[in-house]
């Protein structure tokens, strides 16, 4: 039905794919994420700093190339539009925070609260349902109120949800927090995406849509890597500072690699020692979840500030 009801627009001046730009962007992403993971795993060593600096350098080369070739992979001219910049930044920060916290939340439900995979999935179902509800309501809201107001309110509500998750622990804190987060973030991925596409010239709408999708995927991957690195540092610090008498240094190092490793190691130790290790590991992972939740709250508040500043004069979107 798509070809019959969806009119297609083709850019008559579309150029060829620049393979060098593809390779540069891929190298920049991989080097940066590798550097972040090495930084969390081994500290500020030669490998981590070299990878991060190399990733930044390759990223700079990529951006420089985009400004000098006829058919860039990333059209920097799109960023001249303030609504485009604001919506894309909010989109990126929201995805970064959401994916970064979610990776900890699923482990927390199973390895700290002891839920089965099915129970953990059911515990996250309210978040998903509220996200769907918020997405379905967003077009009606956007037809009545300015997009900036909806996005700022949604991002502020999401920040409150992240903060609630960072303040408490247990299932009865987590589920209400994720409900608020889902309702608040939904407009960012619906209204925000529409602003990204409609802010671009018609001949660049495809490029804007592709950039929106790419930013979402990249921000999600970066959120997992960045928040995972921060959370791992918090978890290890809590585990190292815990009183665990008689636990060998190599066992403590293995437990510090991941919560799953600590749970597995606890099963091989004497009962009293395994219980102490498991309690310390679960407390440390709870600290890590709360730290990443607060980081997520800060990020979405920054996104709300950007939207409030750059989208002040944008009217309500047309209905439909």
List where the protein language model places each region:
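Residue-level hotspots within transmembrane alpha-helices of multi-pass secondary transporters
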Residues: 30, 136-140, 191, 221, ...
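Interfacial helix-cap and linker-helix signal at transmembrane-aqueous boundaries
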Residues: 36, 109-110, 141-142, 230-235
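Cytoplasmic loop-to-transmembrane helix junctions
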Residues: 204-211
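Hydrophobic transmembrane-helix bundles of small-molecule transporters
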Residues: 1-90, 97, 115, 123
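Hydrophobic transmembrane architecture of multi-pass small-molecule transporters
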Residues: 194-195, 215-309, 320
């Amino acid at each position: 039905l798509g070809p019959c009801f969806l009119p297609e627009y083709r850019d008559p001046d579309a150029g060829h794919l620049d393979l060098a730009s593809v390779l540069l962007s891929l190298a920049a992403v991989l080097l940066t994420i590798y550097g972040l993971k090495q930084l969390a795993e081994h500290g500020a060593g030669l490998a981590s700093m070299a990878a991060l600096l190399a990733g930044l350098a390759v990223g700079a080369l990529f951006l420089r190339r985009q400004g000098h070739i006829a058919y860039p992979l990333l059209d920097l001219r799109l960023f001249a539009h303030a609504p485009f910049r604001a919506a894309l930044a909010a989109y990126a920060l929201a995805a970064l925070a959401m994916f970064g916290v979610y990776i900890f939340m699923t482990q927390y439900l199973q390895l700290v609260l002891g839920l089965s995979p099915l129970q953990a999935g059911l515990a996250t179902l309210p978040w998903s349902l509220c996200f769907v509800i918020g997405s379905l309501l967003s077009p009606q809201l956007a037809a009545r109120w300015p997009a900036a107001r909806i996005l700022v309110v949604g991002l502020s509500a999401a920040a409150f949800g992240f903060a609630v998750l960072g303040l408490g622990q247990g299932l009865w804190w987590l589920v209400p927090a994720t409900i608020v987060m889902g309702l608040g973030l939904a407009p960012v991925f619906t209204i925000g995406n529409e602003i990204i596409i409609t802010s671009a010239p018609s001949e660049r709408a495809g490029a804007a849509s592709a950039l929106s999708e790419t930013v979402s995927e990249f921000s999600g991957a970066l959120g997992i890597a960045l928040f995972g690195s921060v959370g791992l540092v918090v978890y290890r610090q809590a585990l190292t500072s815990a009183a665990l008498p008689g636990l060998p240094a190599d066992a403590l190092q293995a437990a510090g690699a991941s919560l799953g490793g600590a749970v597995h190691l606890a099963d091989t130790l004497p009962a009293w020692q395994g219980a102490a290790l498991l309690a310390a590991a679960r407390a440390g992972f709870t600290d890590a979840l709360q730290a990443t939740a607060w980081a997520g709250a800060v990020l979405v508040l920054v996104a709300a500030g950007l939207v409030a500043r750059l989208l002040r004069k944008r009217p309500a979107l047309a209905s439909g």
